């Protein structure tokens, strides 16, 4: 366990917002909740909120949240907890000292590198990407990356989760749970993998996502499903996704305060329903193109919105996740890589704990295998930068500098041999001299990424589930109708 989670440890985060900025945003969110409220389309959620002191009017789905109710309910959410892997080796402590990276999910198309066109995703894409994610050292969490079009609409989520469980040992994130039955089926599957429901509830093997409907609305069926997850101690990624200027204020602080209000409302629901259930303050806010109103994922404004949400999660002491790889690029390449690098660096700088989005640009709709590998390379570089470096007697190497002296070489020194393994070794970037690069085919990063994908798929063998467990998962899938 220690070796895996240590690679994601980072230095203390910085801040774009001052403490007074954060207080103003928080106070604005509380005012929104108390005076405007949230439209809660779940009768179960409204009942739980009413019992906790929220203002629920008979015959209305709008709920208002007095400040003291919000404070009381948010205080019930745990400040730290661990996301479990299939085995404890891949456990991920959420304690504010790590930055983890997860694949994106629910892509509705796949980029074909040969034809430069799109195709429909299938279940095999989930198997392949789960296997690749299992192999890649900086992928911490796997989320089924596409919607499997070759599976029945009713059960494609369950099919995808089974394939994910069979092809990676890492923590799993369920993004697309659409109803309570899907949640129960996935919980049953997780319990089979871990050997029982109590172990499943204790380990937090699966976390689930609940997206708000900005501005200030919650879908009833999805909220009911999240309540089932919460009952079973599955961490809920509360994901608010306002588009500044369309479904949120165009000013960044305005959109952050509104998404903060939405997030607080969901924390209140889950803590009223299942006190002490683990919450993750998620956020994937974006900006708009002022000329067309279209989505601009990966813009500086989108990046700052994500950073602001991370800071507000830290303000209330809740673990966070955010969309650090949310490029709006329509294909793999320079735009996707540049936008993702800037966003990922920014999210890590402010203490992003779970950074979402590897491999699925164009507003989290397009799976591209080569961009998946490029994004992974970016994640590794970001982690290396924010891990920092030690300042110790050995690291300062003053005695060695005296020994080598002026004009000497450090290459053959034992100190160099011992410490050079700490240098970041890229999987895809080229560092050969020009002539050697040409001799090897003058391949660009995209070509090398595709070659690496083929190599991983041919050679990596994930640790399989016991045959009896796979059979039980298959039975659950067949019974899901």
What spans do the regions from the language model cover?
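Short beta-alpha connecting loops at secondary-structure transitions
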Residues: 10-14, 292-297, 325-332, 360-371
């Amino acid at each position: 366990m220690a070796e895996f989670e240590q690679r994601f440890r980072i230095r203390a985060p910085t801040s774009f917002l001052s403490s007074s900025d954060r207080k103003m945003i928080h106070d604005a969110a509380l005012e929104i909740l108390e005076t405007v409220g949230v439209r809660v389309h779940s009768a179960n959620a409204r009942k739980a909120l009413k019992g906790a002191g929220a203002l629920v009017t008979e015959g209305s789905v709008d709920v208002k949240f007095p400040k003291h109710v919000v404070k009381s309910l948010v205080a019930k959410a745990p400040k730290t907890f661990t996301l479990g892997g299939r085995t404890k080796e891949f456990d991920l402590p959420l304690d504010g000292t790590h930055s983890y990276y997860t694949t994106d999910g629910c892509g509705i198309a796949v980029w074909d590198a040969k034809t430069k066109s799109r195709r429909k995703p299938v279940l095999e894409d989930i198997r392949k990407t789960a296997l690749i994610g299992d192999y890649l050292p900086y992928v911490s969490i796997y989320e089924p990356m596409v919607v499997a079009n070759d599976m029945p609409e009713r059960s494609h989520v369950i099919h995808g989760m089974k394939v994910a469980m069979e092809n990676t040992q890492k923590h799993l994130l369920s993004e697309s749970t659409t109803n309570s039955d899907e949640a129960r089926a996935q919980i049953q599957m997780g319990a089979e993998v871990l050997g029982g429901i109590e172990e499943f509830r204790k380990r937090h093997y699966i976390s689930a996502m609940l997206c708000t409907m900005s501005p200030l609305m919650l879908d009833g069926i999805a909220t009911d499903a999240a309540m089932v997850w919460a009952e079973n101690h599955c961490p809920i990624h509360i994901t608010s996704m306002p588009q500044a200027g369309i479904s949120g204020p165009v000013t960044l602080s305005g959109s952050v305060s509104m998404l903060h209000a939405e997030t607080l409302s969901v924390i209140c629901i889950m803590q009223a329903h299942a006190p002490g259930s683990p919450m993750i303050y998620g956020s994937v806010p974006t900006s708009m193109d002022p000329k067309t109103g279209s989505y601009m994922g990966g813009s500086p404004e989108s990046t700052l919105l994500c950073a602001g949400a991370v800071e507000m999660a830290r303000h209330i002491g809740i673990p966070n996740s955010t969309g650090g790889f949310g490029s709006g690029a329509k294909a793999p390449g320079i735009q996707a890589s540049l936008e993702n690098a800037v966003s990922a660096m920014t999210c890590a700088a402010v203490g992003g704990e779970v950074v979402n989005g590897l491999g699925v640009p164009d507003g989290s709709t397009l799976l591209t295998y080569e961009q998946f590998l490029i994004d992974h390379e970016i994640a590794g570089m970001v982690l290396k930068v924010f891990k920092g470096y030690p300042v110790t007697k050995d690291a300062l190497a003053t005695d060695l500098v005296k020994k080598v002296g002026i004009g000497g070489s450090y290459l053959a020194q034992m100190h160099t041999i011992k410490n050079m393994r700490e240098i970041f070794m890229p999987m895809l970037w080229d560092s050969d001299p020009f002539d050697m690069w040409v001799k090897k085919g003058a391949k660009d990063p995209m070509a090398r990424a595709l070659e690496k994908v083929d190599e991983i798929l041919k050679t990596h063998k994930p640790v399989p589930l016991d045959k009896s467990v796979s059979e039980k998962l298959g039975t659950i899938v067949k019974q899901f109708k």
